[in-house]
């Protein structure tokens, strides 16, 4: 099959898949597929040759490739389908005016920036609802995750970065880097719709003044900056700026979803998967348990909830092939519960280990009055300070927006540090909860690295840190949350070299739990590429007739 023919068929499948999504939204269905968009049915057990848990990057790849192979597949997603307009005529709410759609069953939003000028003006009281963003709390770390069809792609900043080859090879010594960089990274970028900002427009537009100011300060320090690819459609963004398209990135939308412009998974991989006619997505269903029948069938127990969070049904599913794409937290929790409760007792002892935050630390700097960052800021980062090659202190710092509609002279960053600290998850049988052994000392390593870099920038530019952004305690470095949870079922340890879970046949992991705690860049392109590699091998060897 030629590339052009593949692209034409994929386009046709995308159209069919998008139609299925629209039909499900219009009729309020919780099950989405070309032949089966319908409300949930009271069948005792749903069976399919393959089941995918989760519809984030790894799960979406698995769903598309299974569907293309003609294998009937069910995708189980605990969040809702996000394509029905709210009372304001929009699917998602803005960052500055959050409502019930913003957070997963919370009474109040929990944004990464908690205060401004030490005032509690960022977070808002909201109604409880299966919103699009969740913040999962552990003792010394909290993790942001997306909830909905498309997972984290709905709520991230779209930065589609391929890691430095040398660091990828160090993190994945058993993976063929030539194959990854020659085949699977390009395949992932093409399917995700990765593009780059037009440099001339970037230099001239008011919407990226904040990036240019940070670039100037980095250059004065002797540091290198680099443009960062994105899955946000920059053609659409330029039309937003021109007033010929509805504003999304230029309208303050990002962490609670984008109404336009973003190529989230429901518009790419998942639309293509549904378009095959072989894939059905079940929403608002959370898998609680996995076991295996004597004949080798995997048996799943899932709770279906309504929009109040009430469990309205507990269902069982059966499948021959089971793909775990629930993310670092979701997949690890399911496997640990199965191992510790004895339903999958042969799982490897390394399940739960090797977890890290990708070295995430957020911070702000106070600029001089003449270094205005602009009242108008795009919510999509397109540039980073790249000091990763500094062996003594490797850091990649995203130049992040802080769109308030007012000039505030703040330069904001999400630093990705090479933090070698790792923690393990455990399962508490008494409370049926996942526990994380991450400590404040683990986070302190990332803080020290970020501080070392930004102390240099402040010294070169005679600037200081902002102390008013992360709560009432004058905290400079926000080290208690991560956007990039990685690990828990590490490739080559808890699995073989292709994501096959040790101890069980036809059980696979395709998500960020495969990554050993650190990538040095935003991880979703790597997760997608690794999932493509897994699916190519599994479909060639495990499902062949």
Task: Tell me the role of every PLM-derived stretch.
Residues 451-518, 524, 528:
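A glycine-rich dinucleotide-binding beta-alpha-beta segment and adjacent secondary-structure elements
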Residues 122-145, 149-156, 170, 174, ...:
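FAD cofactor-binding and catalytic pocket of flavoenzymes
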Residues 291-316:
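Conserved beta-strand-loop-beta-strand element in the redox core of flavoprotein oxidoreductases
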Residues 1-14, 36-38:
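N-terminal secretory signal peptides
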Residues 10-27:
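N-terminal export leaders
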């Amino acid at each position: 099959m030629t590339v052009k023919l593949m692209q034409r068929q994929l386009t046709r499948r995308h159209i069919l898949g998008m139609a299925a999504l629209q039909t499900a939204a219009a009729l309020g269905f919780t099950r989405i597929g070309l032949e089966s968009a319908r409300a949930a049915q009271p069948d005792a057990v749903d069976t399919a040759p393959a089941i995918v848990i989760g519809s984030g990057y790894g799960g979406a790849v698995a769903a598309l490739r299974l569907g293309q192979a003609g294998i009937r597949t069910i995708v189980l997603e605990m969040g809702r389908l996000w394509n029905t307009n709210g009372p304001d005529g929009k699917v998602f709410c803005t960052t500055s005016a959050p409502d019930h759609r913003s957070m997963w069953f919370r009474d109040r939003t929990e944004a990464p920036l908690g205060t401004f000028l030490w005032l509690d003006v960022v977070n808002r009281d909201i109604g409880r609802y299966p919103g699009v963003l969740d913040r999962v709390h552990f003792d010394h770390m909290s993790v942001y995750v997306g909830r909905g069809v498309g997972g984290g792609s709905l709520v991230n900043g779209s930065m589609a970065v391929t890691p430095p080859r040398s660091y990828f090879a160090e993190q994945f010594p058993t993976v063929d880097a030539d194959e990854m960089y020659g085949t699977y990274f390009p395949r992932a970028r093409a399917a995700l719709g990765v593009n780059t900002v037009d440099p001339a427009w970037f230099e001239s537009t008011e919407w990226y003044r904040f990036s240019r100011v940070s670039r100037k300060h980095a250059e004065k320090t002797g540091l290198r900056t680099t443009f960062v690819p994105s899955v946000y459609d920059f053609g659409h963004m330029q039309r937003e700026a021109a007033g010929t398209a509805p504003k999304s990135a230029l309208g303050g939308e990002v962490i609670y979803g984008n109404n336009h412009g973003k190529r989230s998974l429901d518009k790419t991989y998942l639309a293509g998967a549904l378009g095959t006619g072989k894939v059905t997505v079940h929403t608002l269903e959370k898998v609680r348990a996995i076991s295996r029948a004597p004949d080798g069938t995997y048996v799943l127990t899932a709770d279906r909830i309504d929009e109040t969070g009430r469990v309205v049904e507990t269902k069982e599913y059966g499948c021959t092939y089971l793909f775990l794409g629930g993310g670092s937290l979701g997949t690890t929790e399911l496997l640990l519960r199965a191992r510790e409760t004895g339903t999958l007792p042969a799982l490897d002892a390394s399940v739960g280990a090797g977890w890290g935050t990708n070295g995430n630390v957020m911070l702000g700097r106070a600029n001089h009055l003449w270094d205005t960052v602009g009242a108008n800021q795009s919510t999509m980062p397109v540039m980073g300070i790249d000091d990763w090659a500094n062996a003594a202190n490797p850091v990649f710092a995203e130049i992040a927006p802080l769109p308030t509609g007012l000039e505030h002279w703040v330069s904001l960053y999400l630093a990705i540090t090479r933090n070698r600290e790792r923690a393990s998850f455990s399962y508490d049988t008494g409370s049926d909860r996942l526990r994380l052994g991450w400590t404040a000392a683990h986070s302190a390593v990332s803080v020290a690295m970020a501080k070392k870099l930004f102390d240099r920038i402040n010294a070169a530019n005679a600037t200081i840190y902002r102390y008013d952004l992360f709560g009432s305690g004058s905290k400079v470095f926000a080290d208690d949350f991560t956007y990039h949870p990685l690990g828990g079922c590490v490739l080559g340890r808890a699995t073989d070299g292709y994501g096959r879970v040790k101890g069980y046949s036809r059980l696979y992991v395709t998500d960020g739990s495969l990554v050993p705690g650190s990538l040095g860049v935003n991880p979703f392109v790597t997760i997608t590429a690794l999932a493509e590699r897994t699916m190519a091998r599994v479909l060639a060897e495990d499902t062949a007739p």
